[in-house]
Amino acid sequence: MARGPKKHLKRVAAPKHWMLDKLTGVFAPRPSTGPHKLRECLPLIVFLRNRLKYALTGDEVKKICMQRFIKIDGKVRVDVTYPAGFMDVISIEKTGEHFRLVYDTKGRFAVHRITVEEAKYKLCKVRKITVGVKGIPHLVTHDARTIRYPDPVIKVNDTVQIDLGTGKIINFIKFDTGNLCMVIGGANLGRVGVITNRERHPGSFDVVHVKDANGNSFATRISNIFVIGNGNKPWISLPRGKGIRLTVAEERDKRLATKQSSG
């Protein structure tokens, strides 16, 4: 039996949303252990080389990182396989660019540029609330942050807004019907809509019904829901398409319309 950590990842076994081609190599970068799961993260090397095209090879990415140019959530990261994940803010000071990792409606991480103001905070979903040693209350977020002494009104599934400079909670959104949310797992990954209803199933998974801006309704498990705004107003800027998934026919019509208007 193999002992110790796994250090390799075959290219065909890598997550589909990294969009690596099969034939350019045998292996893929295996993400380091970190705040996001292997299948739900995007290693820094894939973001810099395959998405932004700032490097051609892994060696070049290493040289960029080792010069301490790349910050994730306000902290310098030199590990090329660091697992960046949903809602992380990637800053490149040399170019003055800031990106937030959010899903597009195809379930992939979009290269979504944000302003300097927006890069100062991130949203985190509350996964768990516990009482620690000496009765100190803690909350644990989706990106493995532990925050002590949170506001007692904050409960599991709520979303907290965190200042990346201090790591403190500056605001929060309750998980409630009528609030805007993004789906972060399952078949509806990347869709954005308003929570219309929550079905409680004790002993099983609670189901949440969501309605998007086009009026289409869908349902998913509560664990896949990430609240991103109070009422209809999102607290973060959304990528192109605003989280509205089009059917194949709608996509075709939209493509033809843009073709005719440009032609």
UniProtKB/Swiss-Prot annotation:
GO molecular function: RNA binding; rRNA binding; structural constituent of ribosome
SMART domains membership: S4 (SM00363)
GO cellular component: cytosolic small ribosomal subunit
GO biological process: translation
Chain ranges of the S4 RNA-binding domain: 42-104
Keyword tags: Ribonucleoprotein, Ribosomal protein, RNA-binding, rRNA-binding
The keyword Ribosomal protein belongs to this UniProt entry's keyword annotation: yes
Pfam families attached to this UniProt entry: 40S_S4_C, KOW, Ribosomal_S4e, RS4NT
Family membership noted in the UniProt record: Belongs to the eukaryotic ribosomal protein eS4 family.
Protein name: Small ribosomal subunit protein eS4
Species for this entry: Gorilla gorilla gorilla
